[in-house]
Amino acid sequence: MKIDGTRSNDRATEVVLDYYAAFNRGDWEAMLVLLDEGVVHDLNQGARETGKAAFARFLARMEASYREQLHDIVVMTSPDGNRAAAEYVVHGTYLASDPGLPEARGQSYVLPGGAFFEIHDGRIHRVTNYYNLEDWIAQVR
């Protein structure tokens, strides 16, 4: 979906929607293009990772263990376009066991989630993801 792009918050909305469209296609390169070199990635209930290379490794880990699609994406932005938030519903399949988590057996799950973004000059500088890990674990046990 294209927005007129004349206002900062419209451009920020477009960046976030492009990011999630690339995610849903499994197009990791298109996701990486939208990130600043020093992107900060706050993993849900986990560590903070910094840099595009770290984000690429995260995507490789995700691809190995999960197949996910995000539905019902809603994006909200600040008037200056420097911050954005997204809410969505994750529809996924747990393909291969992720260390420290229950054993994967091809379980399906549906889980609400959200993210916060910092965006400058059309690039994502920070993405912080949230979902209810206990809910996810209960669904895949």
Predicted regions and their residues:
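C-terminal and inter-domain tail/linker signature
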Residues: M1-R141
